[in-house]
A protein has these predicted regions:
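Shared catalytic-loop signature of beta/alpha-barrel
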Residues: 1-75, 79
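Extended hydrophobic packing segments that form well-structured cores
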Residues: 82-104
């Protein structure tokens, strides 16, 4: 579905007076939530005070979806910068890749 599809669904829900929630975490989700008026909750996957997020650390810019990314008022920052506002650790990603599909 991607960002465009998520935004279309959010706008449709808004016209019907409904809220929409994005059930995952990540830079794209934060950007979408910042642009959607009818969303309320940012989901952090499988985290708790003694349970770290199992998603690998693939960012080199300090981006995190751990509990410590939530500020004192309960907000998470939206990454700034080109694209989604994050930089990726391509060495880590390449080292842990299990397949490569190239589409020409």
């Amino acid at each position: 579905m991607g960002i465009t599809g998520a935004m279309k669904i959010a706008h449709l829900a808004e016209t019907l007076g409904l809220d929409v929630e994005l059930h995952a975490c990540g830079p794209a989700h934060r950007h979408c939530m910042a642009a959607i008026r009818n969303t309320n909750y940012y989901e952090l996957a499988l985290v708790g005070p003694k349970c770290r997020n199992p998603l690998p650390h693939i960012y080199t810019c300090g981006y995190s979806d751990q509990l410590d990314c939530i500020d004192s008022e309960g907000y998470v920052p939206v990454p700034i910068g080109p694209g989604l506002g994050v930089t990726y650790d391509w060495d880590y990603i390449d080292h842990h890749r299990i397949a490569l599909h190239e589409f020409v």
